[in-house]
């Protein structure tokens, strides 16, 4: 009974967040390598960064060199200057590369040395795919050894994550085939995204086992860095190929729709009223729809034969359930009656025995997922640690006019390409975290009151490889204290971010920053730690408001007070997520450039 009262009170506290400070009333307008760092000559005031509760410990292995590793030049005359060893020695993980190609040779597999980088890349992806299949199979075999719920939870995540790694590598290999059909063929930007996801899945398996203190259980699999190194080699070689092309997209979203989007689907995506009037399914608690449960509707959609856009209209109400859109359930669109009317809520957390990954109120995996006009809440509360409201690993996904509320680890932007427009996001510690390539545009980011002795950290970006084309951009948005923090704003430190992984990348541009943010701006992972301070990329460009001054910001090599339009443009919708090529199909407004 007490738990029920607590749940209702906590839900009410989320709904009392300052929705009235609407983004559109705030005077808003409307994968790249990190640029060379530069130093700042102004000393910050004497202030010690706090020791906030970490989401996960940083990797204890030595990170690879942050500088680009040159892949071999293409050999146009058809000959090679050596054998596979010559090619492998050009990669960042040469020993691993040589080992697996020697192994193939010993197994009587005839390997002809490649003539071009692109051929070598396909060979690398094939080797990584073969190893991923083996790793997945080994992980599945751990199932009978799951003697408690914690092990079962970590094992289940790892099985699904390695299965997805196999899928991402297989998708990449097919897409890189010169003979692939147009609907399968991929760009090198696509490939870099999928390879980044494949590698991120491995790290997520590891961190999930640490969440529940069962890392010894899956250690035989996750301690083997070979698969991660093989994918890292793919990222490095494909990264060189990416530099030969410009993936910035500037298409006018009012004029462009991809050819695969039908005329009806275009109208459906652009018009919220049309989506409500002619959905494929309706969810309603008053029995006026097809289902009373959102998950039941999602499960029904997963069984459909054709994977075109499928609209589920969720009528107003509070839905107490966890929902999950599987990795193979593509083109799902959830449309509600508004942020304050359609509410999905649950209270899973790590302290309840869930991994961070699986604690999400809403988890989304299928490609091109869209959510509009609804709110997701994790009601676990500040005492329960990591508790996710939304987790997205959906490629080309969009969240439009969506509320996402919690405390620690509110929004898990896990992987792939994502876009958030006019969303409200609230939390305390690391409440926007993960390793997607993601842009937040015209969003309201609300910093809540943490527990006594804690500090607020807005972002914890998880880029663990210098060639991953991932990062967080907050553009034309507002970063402000929520109503529960405002009266005690001076009692708590708040930072824009801290480095979850060695190459963490966050850029904040043309955004209002209030006085809740510490003058230092950014925090180390732990108090006194030097982890990743020279290899991160934390950039600020033309922000405004009382907390926006970069005069007293940290003096790390990885911090950049950006003054160049060319540098800032690398982190826009058009560049970081190549949004001009896919966002028009969603019907959601966006600004491609600065």
UniProtKB/Swiss-Prot annotation:
Broad EC category: hydrolase
Annotated tissue distribution: Expressed in siliques.
Annotated substrate binding sites: 356, 386, 498, 500
Main location: secreted
Identification of the protein by name: Probable pectinesterase/pectinesterase inhibitor 33
Compositionally biased tracts (Pro residues): 34-71
Pathway(s) the chain acts in: Glycan metabolism; pectin degradation; 2-dehydro-3-deoxy-D-gluconate from pectin: step 1/5
UniProt keywords, alphabetically: Aspartyl esterase, Cell wall, Cell wall biogenesis/degradation, Disulfide bond, Glycoprotein, Hydrolase, Secreted, Signal
The organism of origin for this protein: Arabidopsis thaliana
Note: The PMEI region may act as an autoinhibitory domain and prevent untimely PME activity during transport.
NCBIfam families for this protein: PME_inhib
Membrane-crossing residue ranges in chain numbering: none
